[in-house]
Amino acid sequence: MGKSSKKSAVEVAPTSVSVSEGKSGKKGKRNAEDEIEKAVSAKKQKTVREKVVPSKEEAKKVKKQPPPKKVESSSSEEDSSESEEEVKAQPKKTVQPKKAAQPAKEESSDDSSDDSSSDDEPAKKPVARPNKAALSTNSSSSDDSSDESLSDDEPVKKPAAPLKKPVALATNGSKKVETDSSSSDSSSDEESDEDDKKTAAPVKKPSVAAIQKKTQESDSSDSDSDSESDEDVPTKAPAVAKKKEESSESSDSESDSDSDDEAAAVKKEEESSDSSDSDSESESDSDEPAKPTIPAKRPLTKDTKKGQSKDESEDSSDESSEESGDEPPQKKIKDSTTSGTTKPSPKATKKEISSDDESDEDDSSDESSDEDVKQKQTQAKKQAPVAQESSSSDESSEEDSDMESDEPAKTPQKKETAVSVGSNKSATKPGQEEPKTPASNQNQATGSKTLFVGNLPYNVEQEQVKQFFQEAGEVVDIRFSTFEDGNFRGFGHVEFATAEAAKKALELAGHDLMGRPVRLDLARERGAYTPGSGRDNSSFKKPAQSSGNTIFIKGFDTSLDIHQIRNSLEEHFGSCGEITRVSIPKDYETGASKGMAYMDFADNGSLSKAYELNGSDLGGYSLYVDEARPRPDNNREGGFSGGRDFNSSGRGGRRGGRGDGSRGRGDRGRGRGFGRGDRGHGGRGTPFKQSAGTPSAGKKTTFGDDD
């Protein structure tokens, strides 16, 4: 306490000098105090409120009349209680302004009657604000309750109020000069007492109307108390008059922020930002960086209750912190935490952050308090965002939580649908899997009764196929696969009476049927139109993919008959090992070989020996031996597709189409005039126009020019 008071007295040199000048008028002050007590006793008969407040003042004055040393402790304790009363008295500020107007008018009428009317002002002010008068009465009574020995205590308490005056002088210097020249001659000793009270709690002024009436009161008291103006402190009265004028004129004053609380929230934020700048300057001048951070938490109690500006709470908290020491800040922290938890309002917290962003020293404390408020709000209510900065994040987090709460509601539906679909599939699978996978497993394990027969001649008949398989066993059914137009697709299915007969018929794979080596494979029993899917498992693909023991041979004499070529290849490669299959594709237009062959071996050893015969001589021709690949099989399949494309064109054209669909031997087919139809899908003329027009659109115009 002593150190802080000394520092404040040294720094505020002008105000300390003015205080020393005012010491000579202490005796007059005590006389004024007696008059105040008389005036209070007279005013008790007017209103009920006027009776209650003077009784409190007398009780406090009785407590303060012991020796000067006790005055310090009592004032510090009362100031600490005042800081608590300020928190409780804040909700009453908006109710009191109208009631304060009537006593103010009475004061102006009484002040013009006699010289001691200005002494009634400190007693009437508490009538308008009973809960707020504690700080003002304590400051005045502590000054008036002691003699010359009390002058040692005055610099301790008065510098709390003058600390704010240098800021007002620095911020609004021009206005001070004008107000000094106008009001320096019109100050009185009673006004100095009143000014000490006002500066001790300048933020308690309720409205602009009351302030204007107080200025009128000061004018009336100035005109009536010219005889007592010699005892005034010349520096305090101009400052008070300046503050009163600034409260009605500028937005930087402390009382103006109270009037703006009644006006609009936007003006509060602007004025609180300006006042917070001036407060931060005063805090830096007071050389107490630790205390301003603690009182900075006071706006939480006031803003959450009423949304007042930050400047008011900082002024009152700075004064109470300098007077009461370390005890009020602890109580303030408790008040701030309790008020923050009980009354969290999003608007007030938004105003707090708008003012906190403009003062650097208050950021750390306010942010920490905001975080506490946020945590408690989210735990208690979880309804509104705490501040502007966290509003977007809170909204996004709430949206995310909503999305997450929606997703669990949606995903079970998806899971239920998936389960229902799965149940449908599981319900349908047994009926479908009975002919599918179990049949295939049975076909592979126990053997199927049906064989897939591929590479059939297009002019083959069912009787011919039946005779071909008579040696294997009894044929129950023969099904040829056809296109939609009824044309034969070149393969079919043969069903035997027993699985043993079907297995025995597999041995006929590669044998010629009407000049073509027949492809045989166990088929899945699906019905008449299974060859489309059975084609994937057809014999001419399967050996090259499944066994991997197939070689591709070319370079032999193609002028020989198919049977002669087969026999010569079997003799040539017979020394390599067991040959399981020999396939020699042929041109179905002429019946001659296409110049290539495929040969399957039983094991990999035989296959490796067959590779060694690459480049060997067979009938004067050098053989080319290589591993069979899917591409040649696709070529053969392409031959089938060529036939399909052209078969749609009409009669007899399927051979030409297949010839054209092969490896380029189809010039004869095109020479017949309808071989180009394999590239189209409908007849002679239209496919010809498409084939001539699509590759070269320019030739079309050229033909038109020639015509």
Swiss-Prot record:
Secretion signal span: none
Subcellular location: Nucleus, Nucleolus
Gene3D superfamilies listed in its UniProt record: 3.30.70.330
Keyword check for Repeat: yes
Region (Disordered): 1-446, 527-546, 629-707
Compositional bias per record (Polar residues), positions renumbered to this chain: 420-429
Keyword Repeat tagged: yes
UniProt GO BP: eukaryotic translation initiation factor 4F complex assembly; formation of translation preinitiation complex; rRNA processing
Function: Involved in pre-rRNA processing and ribosome assembly.
Name this protein carries in UniProt: Nucleolin 2
